[in-house]
Amino acid sequence: MEHMNFKPGWKILLILLSGIFLSLDIQAQRIKVHGNVKDSYGEPVVGANVIVKGTTSGTVTDIDGNYQIEAPKDSSLIFSFVGYISQSIPIKNRTEISVILEEDVITLGEVVAIGYGTVKKSDATGAVTQVKPDEINKGMATSAQDLLVGQTPGVVVTLTGGKPEAGGEIRIRGGSSLNATNDPLIVIDGVPVDNSGVTGMSNPLSMIPPDNIESFTILKDASATAIYGSRASNGVIIITTKKGMSGKPQINFNANMSVSTSRRTTGVLNADEFRRLIAEQTGTSSQAYQLLGNANTNWQDEVLRTTVSSDYNLSVGGQYKILPYRVSATFTNQNGILKTSSMNRTTASISLTPKFFNNTLSVNMNVKGLYIRNEFPDEAAIGGAVSFDPTQPVKVPGQEIGNGYFMWLQQNTGAVIGIAPLNPVSLLDDRSMISHVYRSLGNIQLDYIMPFLPELRANLNLGYDVSKSRQWNKMFPNSPITYKENKKLGIGQTETLKQLKRNQLLDFYLNYSNDFRQIYSKVEVMAGYSWQKFYKDGSTITTLMPDNEPWYDKTYADHLQLLSFFGRINYTFKDTYLLTFTLRGDATSRFSKDHRWGTFPALALGWKIINEPFMQPVANVMNELKLRLGYGITGQQDISDNYFPYMPLYSMGFPTASYPFGDRYYNTLRPNGYDPNIKWEETTTWNIGLDFAFLDNRISGSFDYYYRETNDLISRIPVPAGSNLTNEIYTNIGSLRNEGVEFSISSKPIVTNKFIWDLGFNIAYNSNKITKLNKSNDADYYIPVGGISGGTGNTVQAHKVGYPAFSYLLYEQVYDKDGNPIEGLYVDRNGDGVIDEADKRLYKSRDPKVVMSFTSRMEYKNFDFGFSLRANLGNYVYDNVQSNNSSYSAIYNSAGYLNNLISRGTKFQNPQYMSDYYLHNAGFLRCDNIVITKYKGLDPEVFSGIDNNVYPRPVTFLLGVIITY
C-alpha cells in the first residue's frame, strides 16, 4: 500500500507565535479619539462600527452614540452601520471627531468568503449565498445548523429527531450520490472538518455555539465549489466565527431558558378498548384473553416528560495594545423529553487577530474547545410505548426477575419469553448509556503582503481538529433486556467504546491582485497547495458483570490522506465583464495509485448589465442587475468509513459470529469486498443566475437555474458468488441527475435608527432522476433500499433508472365503495392474473419537490419580533408505525404475549406491509411549534421517508435575555 506522508514544520509555527507575542509592545504613535455618531434626524446611532482604516481595530458606539478609540494619529477612521453610507475620515491628530451618517440601507460592496479568499458580493460569478445569524430571527438554536433552516433557497436542513444534540441532514440542491456521502463540505474558520462526528457525539457542529457565528457562506454551484475539488460535489458551507475589535472590552451575555414537552403522542387503544378488542377477536375464554392484566397504563406518558433546559453564552472582545481578541464560553444543559436523555455541553474559544510590520503581516489565530456529556436513552422505548399491552403494570410487586419490571413469562414455567417485547420503562431505567467527548479545533493563518511587490500576498494556514471520546453502555444485572434473545440470561453487560479522531491541515497559496487602469482591467491570480490527513483509532470491548469477564473485543485504526494543487484566475473588464477560472487536482489514498488523481476544472462568466450605458436611464431606480453563467466538475470519494475499498482486507466479525473454544468464545475475521479499479465519482454542473436590486437596494434578490449530472456513481452492488470475497462491493456504476430553479427576494420596507423591518421569501424546485444504474442497461433492474420494521428483510424504496432516488416500490391498494382498503387486493398492473413482484409500482419519493420559506423580522430599539414560515411540498412518508401496529393478527402471539394497536387501524387481519395505503403525502407548512399537514403521523418531516417511531420533536417555549456592556 502506497502512502502519502508529509510533516508540517511545527517548529517554524512556534517561532512565528513567539514573534507575535514579543511584538505586542511595538506600537506606532497613537492618540485617543472620541466623538459622537448621529443620523440625519439628529438621533444617536447605537452600535455603529468605528474602525481604524486598514486594520481590524475598532469599537462600537454606546446607547448615546458615543465612542472612544485609540489609533495612530495619521490614520483614518471608518464609520459604518447597517442601512447607512459608510464614511472614512482622516484623524489628522484630532482627539474629537463626530459624524452624521446618511441612510443607504444596503451596500453592494459587502465581502463574502469563498474558497481560499474573499470577493465583493457584486463581483461574485458563482451561486454564493451569505447568511448572518445576527440578522435573522432569534430562537432556541443550540446548534449551528438550526440557523440555516429556511434561510436560503436550495438548502434543506432536516433534523434527525428531537433528542438533545441531535444532528441534522443538510442537503444543497438535492443529493449527488446514491452510496457515497451527500453531506456538504463544512469549513470552520479555514479548517475543513469531518462530518461523521465521533463516538458519543452525533453532531459535528456541536462545538460552534450559534452566538459565536459571524456568517455562513454557502457555495452551491461547481464554479464556486470546484476550488475545493474532491470534497465539494455536495456544496460547501463556510462558517466564519466572530473576531475581536479594538477599543474598550465589550462584554456580551446571552441567557436562554426553555420548557419542552411532547407535541402529541401516537393514538393507541387504551386499556378498556384493548380488552374489548381482545374479547371480540379471540373470545373471553381464549389464551389471549387470559393474558390481560388489570392495570390501565399509558406507556407513552410513562416514557415521556416535560423538561427545562438552559443555555448561557458569555463573550468578551476588545484589544490589548495591538492584539484584537475575542474570548467566549458557552454552557448548555438540554434535557430531552424522552426520560434519561440529556446533554451537558461546555465550549470555549479564543480568537486573536493582530497585524504587524505596518499591517503587512496579518495573523488570524482561532482555538476552540468542547466538552460534552451525553446521556442516551434506549430509543426502542418509543416504539415499545406504542405497542406494549396497556393492561399491564410498570412493575409487579414481589417479582424478582427483571428487577421487578413487568415481563412476559411463560404461564406454566415462569420462564422469560425471549422473543417478547420489552417493558419500555425498563429500557430506560435499567440501562445506562453515557458518553464523554473532548474536542479541540483550531488554526493559525498568516497572510503576508510582499514588501517588494504589494500586489502579491502569501497565505499559510495550519489547522487541526482532534476529538477523543469514551462511551459506556450498560445493561444492569437481572434487567429485562439481559433475558432478550442473544443475551446472557440475567447477566449484566458493559460495552466500552473508545475513539480518537485526528484531522491535520496545511494550506499554502500565493495571491496576486492588481488593477490595470490603462486597460480597464482587474486581475487576480491565485495558486496553492493543500495537504490534509485524517486518522482514527478505537476499540469496542464488552465485558460481563460483575467480574468484567471479556466477551467481545474489537480494535481498529485507519487513516486517509488528501493531497491537492489548485489555482484560480479572476478577471474583470470595465467593472462590467467578469471571468473566473478554477482548476484543482486532488489525490486520495482511498483509491489505488492508478486511479488516485482527479482533475476538476470550473469556468464562470458574469455580466454587470447595470453598468452598461443603455441602463443609465433606470440607474436611479435599479441598483444591481448581473447575469451569471457557470460550469464546473467536482469529485467525490467519501465512502463513509470504507478507507480502502480497492484492497482485499479483513474486518472483525460480530459477537454472534464468535467461535467457541473451551470455555471461551473467540472473535472471527470476515473478508471485505473490494474493487481494485474503483475511482472518482464526478459531478458536472451548469448554472445560470440573475442578481437584482432596486429602490436604493431596499428590494434585492436572485434567480438561478442549475443542471447537475453525476457519473461513475459509487454504488454498492451485488456480485456473483465466488467472484469476490463477499456478495456486495463498492464500484463505479450509474448516473444521477438533479435539475432545478431557485428564487429569493428580500425587502426592507422600513429602516430608521429605531425601527427596522426585514421581509424575505425564497423558493426552490428540484427534480431528481437516476439515468443509469448498471452496465447492461437492464430496464427491469433496481436496487431495493429503505428497510422497515415488520416481516423479514422488507424494503419499501428502490433505486431504478428513470425514477428519483429513494422512490417507493409498493403494491397499488384497491378500495371498496366506501373508500376502505380491501385486505390483500391490489391492482394487477401487468394483467397476468397473478399479484407478484412485477405488479409493484414505483411511486413518489421521500424528497420534496418544492421548498419555500417566508420570514419577517421587526426590530425596535432593544426589542425584536419575528417569525419564520417554511413549507415542503411533494415529499411522501411511509408510515411504518401504522403498517406495523394496525393488523388484528399482531395483537396475540402464540408464544404467550400481546401487542397493542394504534387507534387509526386498517381492520386488516394480517399485516400488509407492501400496500401503498401506508404511503402518505407529508407536505407541510411549519412555523416553529405550529405545523399544518395532511400527514397523520407524529411529524411529517422525516429525512429517510420512513416513519418508524423516531425520537419526537418537542414543542419548546423560550425566554431569553441579552445583556451588552
Segments predicted by a language model, with ranges:
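Short, small/polar-rich motifs associated with maturation and membrane association
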Residues: 1-356, 361-370, 378, 413-416, ...
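C-terminal extracellular loops and terminal segments
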Residues: 145-149, 728-737, 777-808, 842-857, ...
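Extracytoplasmic gating/loop element in the C-terminal half of outer-membrane beta-barrel translocons
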Residues: 288, 425, 817-820, 870-934
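Conserved small-residue
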Residues: 252-294, 731, 748-846
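Short Gly/aromatic-enriched secondary-structure transition segments
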Residues: 267-270, 475-477, 542, 776, ...
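Glycine-rich, aromatic-lined ligand/substrate-binding cores of catalytic
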Residues: 846-877
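Extracellular/periplasmic, surface-exposed regions of secreted and cell-surface proteins
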Residues: 136, 183, 307-310, 345-346, ...
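Short aromatic-centered micro-motifs
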Residues: 50, 79, 186, 571, ...
